Curated annotation (Swiss-Prot):
The protein's name in its UniProt record: Cation channel sperm-associated auxiliary subunit gamma
Subunit structure: Component of the CatSper complex or CatSpermasome composed of the core pore-forming members CATSPER1, CATSPER2, CATSPER3 and CATSPER4 as well as auxiliary members CATSPERB, CATSPERG, CATSPERD, CATSPERE, CATSPERZ, SCLO6C1, TMEM249, TMEM262 and EFCAB9. HSPA1 may be an additional auxiliary complex member. The core complex members CATSPER1, CATSPER2, CATSPER3 and CATSPER4 form a heterotetrameric channel.
Protein source organism: Macaca fascicularis
Major subcellular site: membrane
Listed InterPro entries: CATSPERG, CATSPERG_b-prop, CATSPERG_C, CATSPERG_Ig-like, CATSPERG_N
Signal peptide feature range: 1-35
Pfam family, one: CATSPERG_beta-prop
Single GO biological process annotation from the record: spermatogenesis
Annotated spans, Disordered: 1138-1159
Its membrane topology: Single-pass type I membrane protein
Keyword Transmembrane among record annotations: yes
Length: 1159
């Protein structure tokens, strides 16, 4: 639409002079009230952009988020930190981007403001929330946040000032595997200028790449930088379809005769116009008649990793490059055409993922009329299946010709809701709602839509029973939509039908039958926005029956008058709405503005509360004469004046939100500004903190239940020393890392509002209270005969549960007469009947709780500095099942203590492993387990029942083997007759089929057997010590524990030493040992007996050798002089005498003989 599009069109409103004056007066009053608010709270806002690692400090730098690989440039800096509590031998990496944070106020220079804020102590606090992934089979389901404090950094631009000219704050932009959607909330630390909190979408764009010139470009097509007015002015708005909270990149088509789309990774804070690189071919045939060809991209759907488009009858998809989700080679190189032989008339989105996958539906015409092509997307891989699998919908509902107009998929129920148009032999057409179950291929006709629109006779709504009267206007359905939380179904066209059970429908008469709904957008938090074919906008609160027109309306006229008076850049007299969509619980418009022949595409908030309030004020007022003048007064239809939530419990136990806190390291510079090195160190610390979180899934529980405990375990005692170094400016690297600045937060306080979601385990309760300050004369007294008076209030609260058979709510009213108020205490409780058991965070049942103050819907508002806020209607999604963040862990600490107590001793392995202590085979093994809550920090003994199975093992860690089902049965079942049992217990309780023992924390313990056919039987020792064995143990409470919805499964290794040998091997070793021992004894005895003889023989041989030597010496020197001869003769005689003496005394030692020979 074009021209004065956003002004009221249609019948001319009565222009009574008094009414014009009153409207003008109302505008002035509201404007002045707004101006007062501005004066009290200066309108300032946060500004956030991305900067690459190497572009920190550059003015005007802004980068796109597509790099996903960690950078290895910070490790060298950590090697410099020798006197710091960190371990420089660990691996520290950095992220490719920083968040650059500034703020601006109206009519003030941003650089001056930031500098002033820094000098007054202002520091931005950044909360990064990672969206959990779709495929929970690959990634862990968790709700993770990290809270960082931004570090001040001087600009690198030249500056003549001594200290600083321009500056900004920076924090690392962390990346987490499995998450491509990131929410950044920026708030103030409470010092300096008041700046309201602001939320930014900072998502990874997997459809960008660098070309050969190092420029960034789109992979899906070519980016256009000139947004021509003819692309947007006067076009019809289109719905924005995507997987809720999971799509990092949104895509919007609908530009006439061009294959252009708008793409954004910031929820249209920034956007790009892209010409898609598709072939734009047109294939017409006898089964796919086409009256003409157009390049327009009609339908667009965005999922976590893949984009879908429809052009004419052709469907294409493109998978982005997301290395944080799957392998790099999964990304598409070009658009892929699917369902090439089909004639596709429409794409239908599926807003919620399920079973680790996302879905999309393609409605066909021609040869496969009556079938739906059901697409499944997982890890970037796309597959389609035609449903129903055998007979078409037409054949199963008993008509010859039918057409599926719309389809909606209820993921949790595996059910397709089909809106079917049937044509009968008399050429009449009727519409039905058909349900098809994809799991069992069941099709059921749910509801026949009436042929004509009912006659409401002045009522707001009408229950369709078949007995009411009808108008002459034919019902023309166009779509069907279901909210999986409250199960509320809408059928829409030139009417609006509502149902909560798929059987009984209510006609909402406030929506005029002269209009036709083009599309609906739902917040899935209780609000619905409707766009008609004439671009009117209507609004509905789910569970109520009043439909409000937002545009055109009296409220809109007042609102736009105020905006134009304030010269807002978000409004113009000539504007065109491109789409209407919800972001969280807020409604936004994407609007093209024309001002002075210049076009601008903006995203703006649709002020629903303001419009309803203005509309109420302009429609209900009184003129009372007070003396000589008239006084204007407004009627307040709200049943209460003040509404507050009280007694709210800590949110983390129910929202399952994990949060870490990380502050930047302290820099040893008097100005307090960081440098590139300190920011890089901050990057490395954030990376290591997230790495500790990711690896904190060990089967053996730490003595302290906290992922950061091991980081500072060995340095806590030196904390004062590190502080001493920092206080004396002697810390290495110029930074001081404070250990207490990196921690996990377990005690978040409630924000005085209901949580974003509630997770309920078996029998869990959630309690809170609503305080309502009533209007005057809101109490009455009631008394029966013989009873005391009781106070009753006109203010009532109703609680609507989507699944009353699964959850229950109780409301207790307390009248506070002295405060003219009522306190309603509400308790929501799980009834323990609607869920079996599931893995933590998997296959949760969706439900909801809606709290409504009777008579308040659309009538009660609260004024805040951020604008009006609707009150009286609260809707909270409820997830029933095993909450995320719970796990089972082996309590090794208590197991060792209890085993030492019961067995009177404890013997560890010879080679001690502190990460895996050993247990002695002959001792009774008493295992204990912990239920650890990663969100709240609670860690307590598992009190439920479980089954323990040995599912693998080996004598060494390198020879571990997983057992098959038959082996697991033989090694663990008390019914085994093959002598293969590994262990046994005196516990008598078993599973229903008696196959396995059921144990608990009170069980008498495990006795190791290792019978002759068990794998641990007859192991060969690896050394002189007894054999060892590693058992792979599985512990599960599946089917045996009724205390929780959680299906806990824990697999861990158990090191057993001191295993006995088999009798044969023991006898063999005994015989060998005895043989060796006997041989050694015999050898010793023989040695002792033969040794003297050996000594004697050796002595005789030596004597003879000496005698021979002496004789040879005599004859050799016979010719020498007389004295020499005499001396020789003397020696010879003495030798003879010595020989005679030896004959007489043979006991003389060998040493004496030698001395005699030398004499």
């Amino acid at each position: 639409m074009c021209g004065p599009a956003m002004f009221p069109a249609g019948p001319r409103w009565p222009r009574v002079r008094v009414l014009q004056v009153l409207w003008a007066l109302l505008a002035v009053l509201l404007a002045s009230r707004r101006l007062w608010a501005i004066k009290d709270f200066e309108e300032c806002t946060w500004q956030v952009v991305l900067n690459e690692f190497k572009r920190v400090g550059e003015n005007g730098a802004s980068d796109r988020f597509f790099e996903q690989e960690l950078v290895d440039t910070v490790g060298n800096l950590f090697h410099m930190l020798v006197d710091s509590p960190i371990d420089p031998r660990e691996k520290y990496l950095g992220f490719p981007y920083y968040l650059k944070i500034n703020y601006s106020c109206e009519e003030k220079h941003s650089e001056d403001l930031v500098r002033m804020g820094h000098l007054t102590g202002l520091k931005p606090v950044v909360l990064v929330t990672f969206q959990s992934p779709v495929n929970f089979y690959r990634w862990k389901i968790e709700q993770l946040q990290i809270q960082m404090e931004a570090a001040p950094f001087r600009s690198k631009e030249p500056c003549i000032a001594e200290e600083v000219c321009s500056m900004s704050w920076y924090t690392p932009m962390p990346i987490k595997n499995g998450s491509v959607v990131t929410r950044v909330d920026v708030s103030s630390n409470g010092l300096g200028t008041f700046i309201p909190d602001k939320r930014f979408q900072v998502n990874i764009n997997g459809f960008l790449k660098r070309n050969q010139d190092n420029d960034i470009q789109f992979t899906v097509g070519d980016e256009l930088f000139n947004l021509m007015p003819q692309y947007f002015v006067g076009i019809s708005s289109r719905p924005l379809w995507h997987t809720v909270d999971q799509s990092p990149v949104l895509i919007l088509g609908g530009i006439p005769n061009e294959k252009y789309v708008l793409m954004t990774d910031t929820s249209f804070k920034d956007f790009s116009l892209v010409e898609l690189s598709i072939d734009s071919c047109w294939v017409g045939s006898f089964y796919c008649p086409q009256s003409g060809f157009t390049a327009t991209i009609y339908d667009t759907v965005a999922t976590e990793s893949t984009l879908f488009i429809r052009q004419n009858q052709l469907v294409y998809y493109f998978t982005g490059t997301y290395t944080t989700l799957y392998e790099r080679n999964r990304g598409s190189g070009s658009w892929v055409r699917v369902l090439a032989s089909e004639c596709i008339k429409k794409l239908c989105p599926v807003y919620f993922h399920s079973n680790g996958s996302e879905y999309i539906m393609a409605l066909t015409t021609g040869k496969h009329e009556g079938f739906v092509h059901f697409g499944t997307i997982r890890d970037g891989q796309v597959s389609f299946e035609m449903l129903p699998r055998e007979w078409s919908v037409c054949e199963q509902i008993g008509v010859t010709t039918c057409s599926i107009i719309w389809s909606d998929y209820i993921a949790g129920e595996y059910t397709l809701l089909l809106l079917v148009e049937s044509e009968y032999e008399n050429a009449s057409k009727r519409f039905q709602v058909v349900s098809y179950n994809t799991a069992n291929d069941d099709l059921e006709l749910l509801y026949h839509i009436p042929e004509f629109i009912p006659e409401a006779r002045g009522l707001e709504f009408l229950m369709i029973l078949g007995t009411e009267s009808y108008t002459n206007t034919v019902m023309t359905p166009k779509g069907i939509s279901c909210n999986p939380y409250n199960h509320l179904i809408f059928i829409w066209g030139n009417f609006l039908l509502q149902s909560s059970n798929k059987e009984n429908f209510i006609y909402l008469a406030d929506f005029p039958k002269e209009l036709s709904i083009k599309y609906m957008t739902r917040s899935f938090r209780g609000a619905v926005a409707i766009v008609t074919e004439t671009e009117e906008i209507w609004y509905l609160l789910e569970g109520t029956y009043r439909v409000y027109r937002l545009f055109p309306s009296k409220g809109w006229k007042v609102h736009i008058s105020l905006q134009l008076m304030q010269q807002s850049s978000l409004y113009a007299s000539n504007e065109t709405m491109l789409t209407l969509f919800y972001e969280g619980s807020k409604l936004y418009q994407l609007v093209y503005l024309m001002n002075n022949q210049k076009g601008q595409l903006v995203k703006r908030l649709m002020p629903v509360e303001q419009l309803l309030m203005y509309q109420q004020h302009t429609s209900h007022y009184d003129l009372d004469r007070k003396g000589g003048y008239l006084m204007l007064s407004f009627t307040n239809f709200c049943p209460f004046s003040v509404m507050r939530l009280r007694n709210l419990p800590g949110p983390q136990r129910y929202t399952r939100q994990e949060r870490y806190r990380a502050r930047p390291p302290h820099v040893l510079e008097r100005s307090g500004f960081h440098n590139e090195n300190s920011l890089a160190i901050y990057q490395g610390l954030i990376y290591y903190l997230l790495w500790l979180h990711s690896v904190y899934d060990k089967p053996y529980a730490d003595p302290v239940h906290d992922p950061t405990w091991r980081w500072w375990e060995n340095n806590k005692q030196d904390q004062d020393y590190y502080f001493f170094l920092a206080s004396n400016w002697r810390s290495a690297g110029g930074v001081f890392i404070e250990m207490d600045s990196y921690e996990k937060i377990y005690n978040l306080k409630s924000a005085y509002e209901l949580p974003e979601r509630i997770f309920l385990d078996k029998g869990t309760e959630y309690s809170f209270a609503i305080f309502l300050s009533a209007q005057s004369r809101s109490f009455r007294t009631m008394a029966d005969l013989g009873t005391v008076f009781e106070l009753h209030s006109h203010v009532d609260v109703g609680v609507v549960l989507a699944d009353p058979g699964c959850i229950e709510a109780s409301v207790k009213q307390e009248v506070l007469i002295n405060r003219n108020a009522v306190l309603f205490s509400i308790t929501l409780k799980d009834k323990k009947v609607c869920y079996d058991q599931g893995i933590s965070g998997h296959h949760l049942m969706k439900s909801s709780m809606t709290v409504n103050v009777v008579g308040s819907s659309g009538l009660c508002f609260q004024e805040t500095h951020a604008g009006a806020r609707m009150q009286g209607n609260l809707m909270v999604p409820v997830f029933i099942g095993c909450p995320p963040g719970k796990r089972l862990a082996f309590d090794i600490t208590y197991t060792l203590e209890y085993s030492r107590l019961k067995n009177k001793h404890y013997f560890d392995c010879v080679q001690v492993d502190p990460e895996m202590p050993c247990f002695l085979f002959r001792d009774i093994f008493y295992p204990f387990f912990l239920i650890q809550d990663l969100v709240t920090g609670d860690s307590g003994s598992f009190q439920g029942s479980y089954v323990l199975l040995v599912v693998g093992g080996g004598p060494t860690l390198d020879t571990l083997k997983d057992y098959n089902k038959d082996e697991i049965y033989r090694f663990n079942s008390p019914l085994d007759k093959t002598h293969s049992l590994i262990w046994t217990t005196r516990t008598k309780r078993t599973t229903k089929d008696s196959a396995f023992h059921i144990m608990s924390h009170e069980s008498p313990g495990i006795e190791w057997l290792c019978l002759e056919n068990a794998p641990c039987y007859d192991n060969v020792p690896q050394g002189i010590f007894a054999p060892e064995f590693f058992f792979k143990v599985l512990v599960s409470n599946r089917g045996v524990d009724t205390s929780t919805y959680c299906n806990y499964q824990l697999t861990f290794l158990l090191h057993i030493h001191g295993l006995p040998l088999s009798p044969k091997r023991a006898l063999f070793i005994l015989m060998v040992s005895l043989s060796v021992f006997v041989g050694l004894v015999i050898f010793y005895i023989a040695f002792c007996l033969l040794w003297p003889l050996v000594v004697k023989g050796c002595t005789m041989i030596r004597w003879k050798i000496n005698d021979i030597i002496a004789s040879e010496s005599y004859y050799t020197y016979a010719s020498i002089s007389g004295m020499s001869s005499m001396q020789s003769l003397r020696r010879s005689r003495m030798g003879s005498m010595f020989s005679s003496r030896m004959t007489e005394d043979k006991a003389e030692p060998k040493e004496a003989v030698e001395r005699q020979l030398m004499t």
